[in-house]
Amino acid sequence: MDTSQLKERVAYHAIDTLFSEGKIFDGMKIGLGTGSTAMPAVHRLAQLLSSGKLKKIYAVPTSFQTSIECEKLGIPIYSLSSQQIGGSLDLAIDGADEIDPDKNLIKGGGAALLKEKIIAYNSKEFVVIADERKKVKSMGKGFALPIEIIPEARLSITKALEAQGIEVFLREGVKKMGPVVTDNGNFIIDVKWPKAADVDPKALEESLNKITGVVENGFFTKNTPRVFIVHQDGNIEDL
């Protein structure tokens, strides 16, 4: 199977497993992630709805990408602050860019990390779907950590991080001149630590956000997710 087939396989398996366990149910409030692994999960939910196996859900998307896909598929969407949602969700499902042995995550490859974190941290259960390439022994040295920043603070933040020996890259747009602009009107920087550095995701999630002008960073350490991992041979781990 190619990568897209593996992503569809793990997404469908996760949705079907959660449905069979009663964790996806009529009238539930569900957060829907962003990216190439999360989209098949949205499609599978749409299939359950169109078949009548699932009658109604209250979906909260984490990005414009997900909102548009839900609209195409006929899934009604809400915000976390909608009266029907009330600020909390039953479950959220999303992909990840890196997963360490403690199930800490790096997310934000799709530049939607701020809303992804708001949704994940306000859900009773958080489910992550990914392929085996996303499992790592340590974080912040392979896949660069995305950080959402206020544009005006770009240079001051860059200098503060570089003073700690951290490499900083302003993410450039594709089919758009200049930097990536998030759904919230901010910039994304991607940062990497030296290979010899001791990267502590839990501590860094807190300390990075204390830098003036940082909106949010892509470490997700505060709620341990249930993780579905698909391997190249098609087998799926439920961690």
From Swiss-Prot:
UniProt keyword annotations, A-Z: Isomerase
Pathway the protein contributes to: Carbohydrate degradation; pentose phosphate pathway; D-ribose 5-phosphate from D-ribulose 5-phosphate (non-oxidative stage): step 1/1
UniProt cross-references to Pfam families, sorted A to Z: Rib_5-P_isom_A
Annotated catalytic residues: 116 (proton acceptor)
UniProt keyword Acetylation present: no
BP GO terms, sorted: D-ribose metabolic process; pentose-phosphate shunt, non-oxidative branch
GO CC annotation terms, alphabetical: cytosol
EC number(s) recorded for this UniProt protein: 5.3.1.6
Highest rank taxon of the organism: Bacteria
Gene Ontology MF terms in the entry: ribose-5-phosphate isomerase activity
Enzyme class: isomerase
Sequence positions that bind substrate: 34-37, 94-97, 107-110, 134
Catalytic activity: aldehydo-D-ribose 5-phosphate = D-ribulose 5-phosphate
Oligomeric form and interacting partners: Homodimer.
Homology family: Belongs to the ribose 5-phosphate isomerase family.
Record function comment: Catalyzes the reversible conversion of ribose-5-phosphate to ribulose 5-phosphate.
Protein name: Ribose-5-phosphate isomerase A
Originating organism: Treponema denticola (strain ATCC 35405 / DSM 14222 / CIP 103919 / JCM 8153 / KCTC 15104)
Gene: rpiA
